[in-house]
Amino acid sequence: MSNIEPSNVKPSNIELGTIPLAEAPATKLEAAYIAKKIAPNNSNPNAPVWVFVHGWGASANTWAPLVDELKSQCEIWLLDLPSFGGNTQAVNSPSAVAADIAKILPANTVLVGWSLGGMLLPLIAQQIEQHWPTKTISHCIGLAANAKFAQGDNYTAAMPAETFQTFCANFNVDPTTTWSRFGLLQAQGDSNRKLVSRQIKALHNAPMPEQFTAWQQALTWLGAIDNRVLLCEITTPFLHLFGEGDALVPADAAVAMAGINPLHQTLVVASAGHVLHFSQPAKIAQIMLARVHAKRNKARVAKSFSNAATEYDSVAYLQQKLANTLCEWVPEQAEKIADLGCGTGYCGLQLQRPERDIYSLDLAQGMLHTARSKALAKQQLFSGVCADIECLPFISNGFDALVSGMSMQWCEDLPAVFSEAHRVLKPNGEMIFSTLGPQTLFELREAWAEADIKLGRQGCVHVNTFIELDRVEIAAKQAGFVIEQTSREIHVLTYDSVMPLMRELKTIGAHNVNPGQEQGLTGKARLKAMAQAYEQFRTAQGVLPLTYEVGFYQLLKV
């Protein structure tokens, strides 16, 4: 995850009433919930509709800054919850609200919710999965939405229960004053606090006397919802965004949510408070769009390594040898360590000490499952998170050390990787990692190129490419790291023929996942031509070599 810096943004000048609308709501239920439908100029009928659900004390107006960023790229529906905005529906439970919203959703949806609205997303997703087989939620994106709003039942990454109870009691006595104080809390901890406060005053309306009772009821929903079990059961993809300075939903919730379901992606947005979409709308829009339109190769990397997880250790002797070297570089005094790209958990097991807390992170859920099984078999604790090294779901200044063995080469954005690593490390924390250089697999790359020329099929990408190690060092320094130690090594594996070489690459998940790869099976003629071309590398000892260029690095955050 990139370290999200505060944007220089102005208060939104959107007046939702002036935005062109799509067709009017057709049913009574739609008329109650849908405040606005906003169609882009060039609408793609196959694209998902983005549906937004606001939080307590707000209305559809809260999304104005994000609408400004997204309106040209997707169709948008803005909903009002019962007794908020223009929705006068009387609904007596969160599950009933979720059922209503599920009924009115279009066939293909990206569902976005903030605070209470975000806590409703798992309930809505459950409704769709269980009762609406013709509808799909392609992504759920929660902003400042915890699994449980207040502490209790062994969940501590939330607002203290006493604080929440006091707030509810104060609202019952003096709703208007309490709502005003709530606005101050929403802006607290945000580097754009003044901007957020102005936006709250402009876009959030205080409750009217006839709304007091319904808003009090909505507060009880906020305290009653506990999505911990549901988040484990639903299959809809989730992205959870949290503000680093949020005074209502602590940033620690990111780790807690990742622990509930390691397949969900979580992200802590630096310098943001509770109303992330007021503070940094451009950045939040960018994050959401990137999630929904994620590059295919990342998904292919995850799938490739997930498929390899069960057999990976049987052929990963080089990877384990390199991991042993890496672990020797980790400071003994490091107590809180994150293993980035943990694979089957080899590094984590080597680093385990009674006094250490180790967090294992991987993009491939299959690898995490294998790592968890290995740890439990050794009666060791396991904390696993399914996430991208470029999008770390951790708070700032939290780790003594980061370890990453042979994973960095799969990242697309090295500046983001090092920026994130620098953010989550404590001062004087260290990042120790190994990665592959461009000489890696050069024999296979050249053999395929020669075969393609012979068969008149130039331009195909058969072998993963790796960046120059000098560029790795430059990116690390630009992020603020000092390079304490570095080493470059060449390792050569040998094989009797090409086929076991290819099978081994597939078994460890390191076969081609680059853009430009031809789809479908590789024909026998092409494999034969490649094998013949590879023969030029056969050594005097009668074996075929396969080269790995490896860089080791120890970085210091100063």
Curated annotation (Swiss-Prot):
GO terms for biological process: biotin biosynthetic process; methylation. Residues 1-287 are annotated as: Carboxylesterase. Its EC number is 3.1.1.1, 2.1.1.197. Coiled coil: none annotated. It comes from Saccharophagus degradans (strain 2-40 / ATCC 43961 / DSM 17024). Keywords: Biotin biosynthesis, Hydrolase, Methyltransferase, Multifunctional enzyme, S-adenosyl-L-methionine, Transferase. The active site is at S115 (nucleophile), D246, H274. This is Biotin biosynthesis bifunctional protein BioHC. It catalyses: a carboxylic ester + H2O = an alcohol + a carboxylate + H(+); malonyl-[ACP] + S-adenosyl-L-methionine = malonyl-[ACP] methyl ester + S-adenosyl-L-homocysteine. The keyword Methyltransferase applies. Gene3D superfamilies: alpha/beta hydrolase, Vaccinia Virus protein VP39. Pathway: Cofactor biosynthesis; biotin biosynthesis. InterPro entries: AB_hydrolase_1, AB_hydrolase_fold, BioC, Malonyl-ACP_OMT, Methyltransf_11, SAM-dependent_MTases_sf.
